[in-house]
């Protein structure tokens, strides 16, 4: 870079700034962009003295890494665009991948209506950023776009947003979330590690990705009927979550979805047919578990270490049971297995030390390894005539 260059005034006739044009101009303080409509990749990357930039109203593209690493850049201004009188529309604009990554002094940000796409990592690690207001034209927020913006507390979404990318707001400080009715997809890890205590989903939402809200502080959830995909670990480790209502679009609770939600006491899931591995494991105060006549599949450890459960009836509709489903349910007193299962899988009631009553159907033919290990309160087991196999350590302890 031209390390001594301090001021740039571009002529109004110039339309495009090319790739790496001013890359590494470490003394550059002032830039007047004239009527530029395109800024190329890495154009001002590493201009560490640049403190402010004003983008002209005809700008349509800010390239990848264009201002990445401009560590003194604290002010970004977009000139207001006038409506095109022939089309009555604003021109569109994109902000590229990593465009402002690591601009550690940007405090507030207002994205104009003309911006339709924010690239991956666009404002990642902008550590001073506290507030973002998105324009009504924005459709997509890229992966990691605001990830690790550790002071970000306020976000206002526009009316056109459809997609929030992976880790888009992970490890920010957002206390609440209200999504517009247009939002369809929340990507994996999107709000991972945020202190969200309030989440309002819209009825157009379709997908909530894996770990999207892992560890947030929300106390209740109402998932709309439009949601058909709820990813693994989506709300895992949400320690304050006490009540969940799943809409009719959810037919499967994926692996670990509500794992370690230690305050969860109420769950409604009227259309669910499958409960994945460890989906509710370590939900330590969950007493009434969602086993209705729609359920066909219970994954490994689905209710493992749910220590408040006292009674359980596995309905006749269940035909597929994994291992360790009630392992460590130390308050479980009685259990009934329906007619749809033909074996008691390995570790099913392992360490259920208070289990005193068990009812098995005539269809049970085998009892798995460690199935009743350490069931020290179990005085009698009604073994039916159809049982042909009892595996190793089935009643150990």
Predicted stretch roles:
Residues 2-16, 26-38, 48-61, 71-94, ...:
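Structural signature of tandem-repeat unit edges
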């Amino acid at each position: 870079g031209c390390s001594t260059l301090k001021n740039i005034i571009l002529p109004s006739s110039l339309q495009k700034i090319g790739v790496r044009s001013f890359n590494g101009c470490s003394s550059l303080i002032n830039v007047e962009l004239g009527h530029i409509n395109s800024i190329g990749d890495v154009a001002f990357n590493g201009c560490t003295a640049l403190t402010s930039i004003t983008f002209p109203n005809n700008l349509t593209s800010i390239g990848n890494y264009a201002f990445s690493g401009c560590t003194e850049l604290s002010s970004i201004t977009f000139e207001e665009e006038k409506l095109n009188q022939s089309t009555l529309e604003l021109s569109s604009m994109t902000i590229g991948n990593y465009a402002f990554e690591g601009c550690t002094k940007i405090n507030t940000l207002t994205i104009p209506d003309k911006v339709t796409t924010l690239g991956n990592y666009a404002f990642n690690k902008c550590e001073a950023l506290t507030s973002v207001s998105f324009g009504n034209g924005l459709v997509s927020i890229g992966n990691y776009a605001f990830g690790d913006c550790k002071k970000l507390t306020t976000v206002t979404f526009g009316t056109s947003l459809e997609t929030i990318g992976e880790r888009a707001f992970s490890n920010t400080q957002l206390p609440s979330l209200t999504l517009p009715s247009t939002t369809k997809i929340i990507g994996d890890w999107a709000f991972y590690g945020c202190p969200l205590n309030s989440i309002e989903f819209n009825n157009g939402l379709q997908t909530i990705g894996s770990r999207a809200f892992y560890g947030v502080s929300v106390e209740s959830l109402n998932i709309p009927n439009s949601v058909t995909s709820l990813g693994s670990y989506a709300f895992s480790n949400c320690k304050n979550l006490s009540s969940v209502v799943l809409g009719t679009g959810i037919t499967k609770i994926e692996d670990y979805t509500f794992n370690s939600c230690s305050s969860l006491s109420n769950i409604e899931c009227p259309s669910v047919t499958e409960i994945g591995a460890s989906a509710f494991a370590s939900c330590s105060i969950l007493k009434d578990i969602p086993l209705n006549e729609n359920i066909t599949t219970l994954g490994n450890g689905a209710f493992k270490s749910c220590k408040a459960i006292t009674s359980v009836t596995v309905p006749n509709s269940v035909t597929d049971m994994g291992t360790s489903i009630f392992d460590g349910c130390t308050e479980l007193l009685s259990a009934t297995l329906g007619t749809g299962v033909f074996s008691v899988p390995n570790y099913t009631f392992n360490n259920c030390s208070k289990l005193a009553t068990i009812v098995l159907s005539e269809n049970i033919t085998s009892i798995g390894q460690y199935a009743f290990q350490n069931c020290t309160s179990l005085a009698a087991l009604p073994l039916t005539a159809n049982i042909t196999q009892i595996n190793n350590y089935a009643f150990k302890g």
